[in-house]
Regions:
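TM-loop-TM module centered on a large, flexible mid-protein loop between adjacent transmembrane helices
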Residues: 103-109, 113, 266-327, 348-379, ...
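Helix-loop-helix junctions that connect adjacent transmembrane segments
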Residues: 29-32, 185-252, 256-259, 272-276, ...
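Membrane-helix boundary/coupling elements in multi-pass transport proteins
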Residues: 50, 55-58, 120-141, 239-257, ...
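Cytosolic C-terminal regulatory domains/tails of membrane transporters and channels
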Residues: 5, 9, 67, 480-612
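C-terminal membrane-solvent junction of multi-pass transporters and transport-like membrane proteins
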Residues: 351-362, 397-446, 476-478, 484-486
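Membrane-interface loop-to-helix entry segments
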Residues: 3-13, 157-214, 267-271, 386-399, ...
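Hydrophobic alpha-helical segments and their helix-loop junctions in multi-pass secondary transporters
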Residues: 16-23, 185-220, 282-289, 400-414, ...
Length: 612
């Protein structure tokens, strides 16, 4: 019966792929002078990266939380893939602002500015470093599952993989979407056969272990006070989060597709594939009669041997090693693109010099040296690398969610209406991630040391660079000053001075008068707005908030023009105060101005659209 079922499954898989691929344009297509990838292509690229986690994450989760890993790996799958709806929202926001690609770094730069965005750079770099390191170690452990070797030989092979991938990238040899899709087809056959075989081989003992896992998870969550239960909940998610590493990679590929909507489709595909395959394979493997302490590095490979024999185990080991090596290559490519983006933004052109094959060879060499140093420091220990990896991964998620909350606080949903998520739920997700980060920082000293060290170094370098090379410096140089405003108003002999505070995109006013000044505050990260008239003054929000800058302007006017009657005009806020909470906070602050400047007149008005 088992053979019959497997034959039917394989025929169904082959038929499905043949029917789907018969139509052209399923992987890539040509539009307006450029080749674009489809949503399926970028989903498969991320899938092959994310799916590699199944070869090491279940064993790591079991090591920390025992049988309840069966339940929490499944719950974490739902939690993480629900969180990806926020990634889609971020992709939409980035596209709205013309920031295509760059993912976490571009979004954190937009929201948090150059200094804090270096924390995101550090977290992402830690992810890429540890992706390369743990994938190369796991690739060797799976490859040598049937041919045990000495630790020194394993270390040589791990370093060999890293430098071989570096050499391929230096020579300009790159994988493409079609090659990745071919590997995905092969992986689909292997994993579906593994799942089907595992389900058919379930016996009473395996079912009992599954029930034990559910009971163990329930008992842990029902013991002690609510604080203890929350601690158990956070510890369990933090221990399973590694199973879904790489899920953020879709956001990094936004520059390869035409619209943010393709990102949304890709995340739905990942939820229906990796979101189901990973917890299913993990549950089957963790319910099998295996001594997990002896098979932390090759759990899935050994489980495949149990259900379908040694030959199938060798095939799974081959797939695992090949997919993990592809993940190493992904880490090289992604980290080089991130460093290139940062170097280009801050003018370090020597770092992004290319060779004859258009390869960022200097960055690849630096990456290989850094990856190798981490392997040597950790002695190729999958356990230590996993501890480090989880911390950096959760740090990136926390920065993403925090940046989104801050963006929505200030901007609401008016700018990007088609797709937006519930901010309260986003806040709850952020709280969970921050709690996981705190838990791992306390319990995983190796990961904490690495993340803190790299973050500290990058932040220090970022501080030095941002002081002299930040793109905002050129934009700030274009700004007007308060004294320009005063000198302009001083040319008027009128007894009254009128100050109009404009939003960056407001343009309409009547004939300009010499006793009037129109003031626009802008963020240097979004560029200097166009000067609309001689009495239009653009002031940068560099190191202070909007209210503080308004206060500073009014104090200068009060000091320099004590004999003039000053009238201040502020536009009526049209945004919903619930949608843009910052509007309500701003209006509350503006209510203080009459007390601070009792001799000024203040008007918050709406001019109306007129009658046609």
């Amino acid at each position: 019966m088992k053979i019959t079922v497997l034959v039917l499954i394989n025929v169904a898989i082959a038929t499905a792929f043949l029917l789907y691929l018969r139509k052209p344009g399923r992987i890539s297509y040509y539009h307006r002078g450029r080749v674009w990838l489809t949503w399926l292509s970028i989903a498969v690229i991320t899938l092959m990266d994310e799916l590699t986690s199944v070869f090491y994450a279940p064993a790591e989760a079991y090591r920390f939380i025992g049988p309840s890993a069966i339940v929490f790996i499944a719950f974490t799958a739902f939690f993480i893939h629900y969180m990806t709806t926020r990634m889609v929202e971020i992709a939409e926001i980035l596209e709205h602002h013309g920031l295509i690609g760059g993912g976490v770094y571009s979004f954190s730069y937009l929201v948090l500015g150059p200094m804090v965005s270096f924390v995101a750079v550090a977290s992402i770099m830690v992810d890429y470093v540890l992706t390369a390191c743990i994938s190369s170690v796991s690739a060797v452990l799976n490859a040598t599952s049937f041919f045990p070797m000495f630790h020194t030989a394993n270390m040589v092979m791990v370093l060999g993989i890293i430098w071989a991938i570096a050499g391929m990238n230096i020579l300009g040899i790159r994988e493409n979407a079609r090659f990745t899709f071919a590997v995905f087809i092969f992986a689909a056959f292997i994993f579906l056969n593994l799942i089907a075989s595992g389900i058919l081989d379930l016996d009473g003992a395996s079912v009992a272990r599954l029930k034990e896992g559910a009971h163990h998870a329930t008992m842990r969550l029902q013991t002690g006070s609510w604080i203890t239960r929350y601690d158990v909940f956070i510890a369990s998610i933090a221990s399973c989060i590694l199973a879904y590493s790489g899920v953020e990679s879709v956001l990094q590929t936004a520059g390869l597709v035409r619209s943010w909507k393709e990102i949304g489709k890709a995340y739905i595909f990942l939820a229906l594939t990796v979101g189901l395959v990973t917890p299913t394979v993990a549950a089957l493997a963790l319910s099998a009669p295996i001594d997990f302490s002896l098979h932390e590095g090759d759990l899935i490979t050994y489980y495949a041997t149990l259900v379908n024999g040694k030959l199938f185990g060798i095939v799974v080991a081959g797939l695992a090693s090949f997919a993990l090596i592809m993940a190493v290559n992904t880490a090289f490519v992604a980290s080089s693109e991130l460093i290139e983006r940062v170097a280009h933004r801050y003018g370090f052109l020597w770092m992004i010099a290319t060779n004859r094959r258009q390869s960022l060879y200097r960055i690849h060499i630096l990456n290989a040296l850094f990856f190798s140093s981490i392997i040597l420091i950790t002695q190729g220990s999958q356990m230590i690398l996993a501890d480090m990896y989880a911390l950096g991964l959760i740090a990136s998620f926390s920065i993403n969610m925090g940046s989104l909350i801050i963006y929505r606080y200030f901007r609401g949903t008016k700018d990007v209406i088609p797709f937006n998520t519930n901010r309260v739920i986003t806040l709850l997700i952020w709280i969970v991630f921050v709690s996981c980060f705190i838990f791992l920082a306390i319990r995983k000293p190796h990961g904490t040391m690495l993340w803190a060290s790299v973050t500290g170094i990058v932040l220090f370098a970022g501080f030095l660079v941002a002081q002299k090379r930040a793109p905002e410096i050129k934009e700030i140089e274009k700004t007007d000053s308060e004294m320009d405003l005063i000198l302009s108003l001083a040319q008027s002999s009128a007894p009254e001075v009128k100050l109009f505070f404009l939003r960056p995109r407001e343009m309409a006013w009547g004939t300009a008068k010499d006793n009037e000044a129109y003031i626009t505050f802008y963020s240097p990260r979004q560029g200097t707005p166009h000067k609309l008239a001689q009495n239009h003054f653009r002031l940068a929000l560099a190191k202070s908030d909007l209210y503080s800058r308004i206060l500073a302007v009014l104090k200068v006017v009060e000091y320099e023009m004590p004999d003039r009657q000053v009238t201040v005009y502020i536009g009526w806020p049209m945004s919903s105060w619930l949608d843009r909470i910052s509007i309500g906070v701003m209006v509350f602050k503006l209510m203080r101005l009459p007390r601070l400047f009792p001799n000024f007149q203040f008007n918050i008005n709406y001019p109306g659209r007129g009658i046609s």
